Amino acid sequence: MTIQTVTDAICYVGVDDNTLALFENQYSVQPMGVSYNSYVILDEKIAVMDSVDARAAEEWLSNVAQVLEGRNPDYLVVTHMEPDHSGSLMRLAQKYPEMKIVGNAKTFTLIKQFFGTGAWSEDRMLEVGERDTLSLGLHRLRFLLAPMVHWPEVMTAYEETEKILFSADAFGRFGSLERTARAPWVPQARRYYYNIIGKYGAQVQALLKKISALEIKTICPLHGPVLTEGLEECLRLYDLWSQWEPEESESILIAHASIHGNTAHAAKTLKGKLEKKGVQVNICDLTVTDLSYAVASAFYCGKLVLASATYDGGLFPPMREFLEHLRTKGFRNRRVGLIEDGSWAPAAARLMRTKLEEMKDIHLYETVVSLRGTLNQTSEAQMDALVAELCAE
């Protein structure tokens, strides 16, 4: 990744990873890749803002050295200790033995857990707390703790002179900078938010409250592009997302899990009926779609229809996994319709209802479409009744 200038005194020294298949070993990041972001503030004193994943250490160290032009960094500021951001921390600390490590109390607890108690001497650790400042010369960092956005040690750093928020994982996005330079921020930021941070909406709200009084001209996250335009919209969406509110309250996601295609056919039939009535419909095949896309779409829409086959007397596994992801990420405040399929003993609707009862403020439509293999006159009538309910609000 080419070194980029954020401002005259601040450089981007992060690294693109276009070979990683699964982010956190579960979310697809192909073909768009992912970036591990790091920044250098050049002043009377020099601060490196976070490190990168160990798999990108060599390129990152080269980028940092190129920007330093023979100078030594005074500080490594650690806003987040997850290994994709701390994986190269020790490499930089060993290369520059006079450099101090800046973090909060929980940062240093995790450093000792990850790297051992003898990683470096105590006098190299500079502990900061809420609203503490670190002067670099013309630039000054003010630290705002952001616990559980999405790890307990997370903090942000606000550079007061140039009005830059170093936001840790908040406002991040999937996609390497090289491959997604012209891509809109929102789709992959939404997918990133709901799958990585989404469970912690209350904590995101607390962070948004802290930064609401700040004048922010630039946001520098740990994944995705540096944000300089449309910041008001980014903040608005984070406020909406962290309250688990839909972006499109009248749009519908139909998520289906079909074994031999009959349940999928019913889902597509429902989609056609709804579209004839002018409804915006997204449809997702849970047997082939990366679940992170399905989760993001479920939160985007105001209504959800679940269509699942019965399998071994239980839910077909792709639907069961989808519902577990939704529960884990705090899915709530939605209206949900159910379609079940079972050739001799359909049980999917009852089992989906049980899963949904574990979530907050989920309201089920009265009509359940129940198939015995394929749509027939009875189930078609049920589907028409469900369409009427979905369109009544």
Summary of predicted features, one role per range:
Residues 3-66, 156-159, 163-167, 263:
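Conserved beta-strand hairpin/beta-sheet module of binuclear metal-dependent hydrolase folds
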Residues 4-8, 102-154, 200-208:
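Metallo-beta-lactamase
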Residues 44, 55-102:
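Active-site metal-binding motif and surrounding structural segment of the metallo-beta-lactamase
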Residues 45-47, 75, 139, 162-166, ...:
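Structural motif
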Residues 49-51, 73-81, 100-104, 165-169, ...:
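Active-site neighborhood of phospho(di)ester-bond hydrolases with catalytic His/Asp-centered motifs
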Residues 88, 289-294:
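Short acidic active-site motifs
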Residues 177-219, 223-226, 269-284, 294-393:
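FMN-binding flavodoxin-like domain, especially the glycine-rich phosphate-binding loop
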Residues 255-277:
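Short, charged N-terminal beta->alpha structural module
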